[in-house]
UniProtKB/Swiss-Prot annotation:
GO terms for molecular function: histidinol-phosphate transaminase activity; pyridoxal phosphate binding. Its cofactor is pyridoxal 5'-phosphate. This is Histidinol-phosphate aminotransferase. Its EC number is 2.6.1.9.
Amino acid sequence: MQNDIHRHLNPALQKIGAYVVEGGQEAPVKLNQNESPFDVPMWLKEAITREFVREPWNRYPDILPYRGIEAYAEFLGVPAGRVIMGNGSNELLYTIFMACLGPGRRILIPEPSFSLYEKIALLMQADIVSVPMRRGLDFDADLILERAKAEAVDLIVLSTPNNPTGKSLSPDDIRRIATESGAIVLVDEAYIEFSRHPSALPLVDELPNVVILRTMSKALALAGMRIGFAIAPEALMAELTKPKIPFASNRLAEITLRHVLANYSIVKDSVSYILDERERMYSELEGMDGLQPFMSDTNFLIIRVADPRAVFQHLRGEGILVRNVSGYPLMEGCLRCNIGLRDENRRLLDGLSRALR
């Protein structure tokens, strides 16, 4: 009898699919993955590689990347015992979810949010409590808290500023949710450098159940290096890191991080450029017929059009990649485009104008 391999696999695999970037990852104007348009300057790459070639390549790195942890802790002004470094923030999502979830445990996820949250929760066979955003794509903090208490959830994950909506929760709302729900609250601040709201990082000093997640892939322009961090009270961090994969961060990532943090003015300049372009782009999009732009606290903008598939395909035909997010709840007709260089942004505006004629 032929063996059915599916009966040996996690049944949750039947509910999820492989991660796919629609349209691919290569285009003359690539605005679909919320990356920085600025690469690390060559002089800094050369300084990084000069140090890296002196490292032993035949030896494992430290079990945990202590040099990277200490550098980022010093940058934030927090004790190193509160910080963990991962191979991208996605690795830390898996780690934290494994520490908090399992069959019968409950996670609250505002909807829409980063798709990986639901995927990992399903793999962990957890029960998902979905809380919709408001019609304007803003968070409904009152409803989040109401459902968290009613469902006695174990973990709340808040992407703020949110991907894909671009909207934020205030630190006061996060404090209220964490205090009154009693659940562990994971605050994913992947886009915090672009936000009009301050970081929720000070809440780690105040509350025992708040975890902050950071990525170096957006503002720091290190998507290719895979560097992420979590910050939490030391007692909580000691538990969250138990499932962590050892040796997951390589020596090059640690060295790169230290050099970029030591030259942080480069990051500030690029963020300033992106924020200026974001405001200029939003203003121009507001004046265009046939679309509705949404205000954003991130390095991307959401626009709503009548036929997102047709507009997506038209732009792709012009060599411009954006993200079709119209399949997300409450985001019917929406496309997501990250802020690029000025010339790239101009090509996007011109392409949209032609697509909407």
